């Protein structure tokens, strides 16, 4: 499935960014249609909604605290086969969390339910304690959930700087501030020297840096990284790990799913191991690697960090 990039948004408030000088409830500058305005109004209302339980009256636990992205009791069934059952996890701002497990375990389905690409059959997804379970992907993005797909998502027909500028133009109305933000992102992610280069000419590592810089142009509070090490040369692995650390140093919460277990465990603070559709274990990398069950069912007895 080809997925185009969905970006986060400028701040942690519920509304898209209005033009400078406008009130909080003014229509955002980049929403021109009535359909977009209706979507915006719906998104504005989410902070005032409450959720008392599912359709059967089952109550959920108290909402997660502000500064967190959480999933509670997620379940998914395809054709009578349950692939995810009662999965709960939490990511706090400023930490990197791995979502790992063997092929077919259900981790990708869990990840896609959190991004909004797959609809959950049961359970609840919360951002800063508010229910976003039924919001589509683009509205979650407006609220601060950024997503970087596995596939190359860069705009290949644009230069490096125009890739980033395209997002800044949606969220920053002041031209001079946009230029300052652009220069800052180019410098921070070490792509200033290729700013005029066509995106199609970038190496794998350069492309990832530009994609992350472009995603950050909208100031997300959480980033969901789908296979960030896919298609990356071994020499660039450390580069990607450093980029993830830059995100957490900015106070951004990061959720990573990847088949490159060693590289992922080398940069995250915690991990959830999914096995046969459920959470087998949650813990720090050292505890994960030391777990007899995780080694027997997933890592193998000879695995070492």
Q: Where do the language-model regions lie?
A:
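Catalytic Walker B motif of ABC-type/P-loop ATPase nucleotide-binding domains
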Residues: 223-227
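Conserved ABC ATPase "signature" region
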Residues: 176-194, 241-245
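The feature captures the beta-strand-to-loop junction immediately N-terminal to the Walker
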Residues: 100-102
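Conserved catalytic motifs of ABC-family nucleotide-binding domains
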Residues: 219
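Helix-to-loop junction immediately C-terminal to a conserved catalytic motif
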Residues: 115
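Conserved ABC ATPase signature
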Residues: 198-202, 206
